[in-house]
Amino acid sequence: MTQYAVLIYERVPADELPPEVMAAHEKLPERIAEQGAREVAGLALHPNETATSIRGDLVTDGPFIETKEVLAGVFVIEARDLDHALAVAKLTPIVDGGVEVRPLLGFAVAEAT
């Protein structure tokens, strides 16, 4: 199966997400498996204010772009094809935002020991 990154964009900060949305995130790996796919990894990000951006030699506080929706998290899934990945990504609980799906190039990642 092919690996895809699912980028989660959300306007609501993680610490303000309703409990039912947090519970839905916790159940997401199980729901993904029910669709015949697999979650390889999932990570939530600290708020936008904690980001540091680097462009050439310039280091600045904050993300590259100021937007209403911020990158809140990312997870990696294995799916049969893009259509399957999109169907799985639609399971992502979102309050006010969306997700972006991108196929991964497939570089090997070292396993944790």
Language-model features and meaning:
Residues 1-113:
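Conserved, structured core segments of small domains
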